[in-house]
């Protein structure tokens, strides 16, 4: 459960963080 959450967040989080950082 924790591994999947981190894996999913790492992929989606990285994309979301890049968009927010660009703003």
Curated annotation (Swiss-Prot):
Entry annotated with the keyword Transferase: yes
Keyword match Transport: no
GO molecular function, one term: thymidine phosphorylase activity
Catalyses which reaction(s): thymidine + phosphate = 2-deoxy-alpha-D-ribose 1-phosphate + thymine
Enzyme Commission number(s): 2.4.2.4
Gene3D superfamilies reported for this sequence: NAD(P)-binding Rossmann-like Domain
Protein keywords: Glycosyltransferase, Transferase
UniProt record similarity statement: Belongs to the thymidine/pyrimidine-nucleoside phosphorylase family.
Role according to the record: The enzymes which catalyze the reversible phosphorolysis of pyrimidine nucleosides are involved in the degradation of these compounds and in their utilization as carbon and energy sources, or in the rescue of pyrimidine bases for nucleotide synthesis.
Assembly and oligomerization: Homodimer.
Name of the featured protein: Thymidine phosphorylase
Originating species: Lacticaseibacillus rhamnosus
Designated gene of the protein: deoA
């Amino acid at each position: 459960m924790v591994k999947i959450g981190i894996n999913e967040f790492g992929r989606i989080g990285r994309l979301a963080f890049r968009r927010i950082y660009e703003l």
